[in-house]
Curated annotation (Swiss-Prot):
Keyword Calcium assigned: no
UniProt family annotation: To M.pneumoniae MPN_087.
Name this protein carries in UniProt: Uncharacterized protein MPN_085
Membrane disposition: Multi-pass membrane protein
Cellular component GO terms, alphabetical: plasma membrane
Keywords: Cell membrane, Membrane, Transmembrane, Transmembrane helix
Ion transport found in the keyword field: no
Organism superkingdom: Bacteria
Transmembrane segments: 26-46, 59-79, 96-116, 138-158, 211-231, 241-261, 263-283, 284-304, 394-414, 418-438
Length: 440
């Protein structure tokens, strides 16, 4: 495969510094995982803060998370400075600059760079087949995690929601909400921190360990799988994959921003500075981004699976081959120009120019033969697309929007601990999961 001058410079730089860059890349990925594990463990012991007693284990895990988060930012900065030495990586500086502030974006940068280093000398056609299999496995993993999340969440919430709805009739429930609001708003922060039986009605339903296993871990797993999908799509860099790539980019940025704001609100403003109740409300509003991020990741994975299992993947491969052909033409044009200049000074180079022309002609015919062969093979071997119409995808997006609206309503009820009305979000999530596997 011929490369343009800039691509050749990039490849030479990565080949020369491969082991050096891999060391920092693997270090950033390990720090990310330690950062996530620390956050998960800190979240599982979070109850101690609200009960008025500082849990030393919780405090240690938050400190570890802070240390590993800073390490991720530091290593991302080192990688940025390393790549900046090569002019062909100037376009990546914006992404690495964002990664300095947002750990999830830094993780995506590291995954992308590791892919570049791992597949330096691979043939493009074979490489695309490997990536196709990776994308299929990742999207199927997203489906499975989403399904497990919906089933477990429904099994936890449904019995308790039915029990509470049997206790409170709807008119009485509305009156109870108004009474609770009138009690909370005058001095909401003291009320929440002082009345653990009310504030932790949620934890009476779901203890800390099930909350960790059934909610935190699936959420982080799903968003992390989205990071891997983002890295592979960015590595392919195809115009036909721009929509899922843009969606995943927005998801990553939203979860990064929400994570930082939530950290500030929970650890600094709400706990240590004893701020008004409005901060607590903002905290619950921010948490709505997580369901949105999970839905965005899920819908993006559907789009990706559709493309890699249909004839659209053929178009992506042809696009990549056309880019390769264009690069060949550019290189041959540059080489021909050099040879023509040399011919003016040395007539003996005429034979070399003829040989180059013959090589160029044979290379072009070989490329066309591969393209036609690829098109013929793809028409025979590629399976029929499971999405013959847009009906299934429309239903999934429609149900996702409805579930997000219900989650918004339900989060208010959860924060006031009156009724677990967010159960429709999980039920509809299960319906989405069911429709997805039927359509595959």
């Amino acid at each position: 495969m011929q490369l343009t001058t800039s691509q050749q410079m990039q490849t030479n730089f990565l080949t020369t510094n491969k082991h050096h860059l891999l060391k920092y890349t693997n270090g950033l990925i390990w720090c990310w995982w330690l950062f996530v594990i620390s956050l998960v463990l800190a979240s599982s012991t979070f109850r101690g803060f609200f009960l008025g007693t500082i849990n030393i284990v919780n405090f240690v895990f938050w400190i570890l998370a802070l240390i590993f988060g800073v390490a991720v930012a530091f290593i991302n900065g080192v990688l940025s400075s390393e790549l900046k030495e090569n002019s062909v990586f100037q376009e990546e500086q914006k992404r690495f600059f964002l990664g300095f502030f947002f750990p999830q974006m830094a993780f995506c940068n590291a995954l992308w760079l590791k892919l570049k280093l791992s597949y330096l000398n691979s043939e493009r056609e074979n490489l695309l087949e490997k990536i196709k299999q990776k994308l299929k496995k990742l999207t199927l993993s997203v489906f499975v995690v989403w399904g497990i999340y919906c089933v477990l969440a429904t099994s936890i919430y449904l019995p308790n929601a039915l029990r509470i709805l049997n206790i409170y009739q709807i008119p009485n429930l509305i009156a109870l909400i108004n009474n609770r609001l009138s009690e909370i708003l005058p001095d909401g922060n003291r009320y929440f921190l002082g009345h653990s039986s009310f504030a932790f009605h949620y934890y009476e339903i779901v203890s800390r360990i099930p909350f960790l296993v059934f909610f935190i871990i699936p959420t982080i797993t799903l968003i992390t799988l989205g990071c891997y999908l983002f890295a592979y799509l960015r590595f392919i860099n195809s115009n036909k994959l721009r929509k899922p790539l843009s969606t995943l980019s927005i998801v990553i940025m939203l979860t990064d921003v929400v994570g930082i704001i939530q950290w500030i609100i929970i650890d600094i403003l709400l706990i240590w500075l004893n701020v008004p109740f409005v901060i607590f409300v903002i905290f619950w509003v921010i948490k709505l981004v997580l369901p949105l991020a999970m839905i965005g990741t899920f819908v993006s994975s559907l789009t990706i699976y559709k493309k890699v299992t249909s004839k659209e993947w053929l178009a992506i491969k042809e696009e990549q081959i056309n880019l390769t052909t264009m690069n060949i033409n550019i290189n041959m044009g540059e080489q021909s120009s050099k040879n023509m200049n040399s011919f003016e000074n040395h007539e003996s180079n005429e034979r070399n120019s003829l040989q180059i022309y013959q090589q160029h002609s044979s290379m072009m015919s070989e490329t066309k033969r591969k393209q036609s062969s690829l098109s013929y093979d793809a028409r025979i071997l590629l399976p029929k697309s499971p999405y013959n119409t847009k009906k299934t995808l429309f239903l999934i997006i429609f149900f996702s929007i409805i579930s997000l609206i219900l989650a918004t309503i339900g989060s208010v009820f959860i924060s006031f601990a009156i009724v677990q009305i967010s159960i429709p979000f999980y039920v509809i999530g299960g319906v989405i999961w069911f429709f997805t596997f039927i359509s595959l």
